[in-house]
Amino acid sequence: MNFQPLGKRVLVKRVEETKTTASGIIIPDNAKEKPLMGEVVAVSKEITDIANGDKIVFAKYGGTEIKLDNNEYLVLNLDDILGILK
């Protein structure tokens, strides 16, 4: 299913963090915080500074979670994006 964000929004797939610490301790899913980084999957036509495939950092409480084709995504307003990782 294709999703085209409207307004000044982007569709982001969260970057999954590792499930173990450097010393090998396994972190259960319910103890992990949701990552604040993701990869841009779709961009509104109004946004020119961000492109598909960019890795971004976003605000902790920003965005709306949605599910498409059994995958979880986040729809973010441009104001919730803090920066692009290069």
UniProtKB/Swiss-Prot annotation:
GO biological process, one term: chaperone cofactor-dependent protein refolding
Gene Ontology MF annotations: ATP binding; metal ion binding; protein folding chaperone; protein-folding chaperone binding; unfolded protein binding
Keyword Ribosomal protein (UniProt): no
Keywords: Chaperone, Cytoplasm
Entry's transmembrane regions: none
Main localisation: cytoplasm
Subcellular location field: Cytoplasm
Pfam families: Cpn10
Oligomeric form and interacting partners: Heptamer of 7 subunits arranged in a ring. Interacts with the chaperonin GroEL.
Function: Together with the chaperonin GroEL, plays an essential role in assisting protein folding. The GroEL-GroES system forms a nano-cage that allows encapsulation of the non-native substrate proteins and provides a physical environment optimized to promote and accelerate protein folding. GroES binds to the apical surface of the GroEL ring, thereby capping the opening of the GroEL channel.
Name of this protein: Co-chaperonin GroES
Organism this protein belongs to: Campylobacter jejuni subsp. jejuni serotype O:2 (strain ATCC 700819 / NCTC 11168)
Lineage: Bacteria, Pseudomonadati, Campylobacterota, Epsilonproteobacteria, Campylobacterales
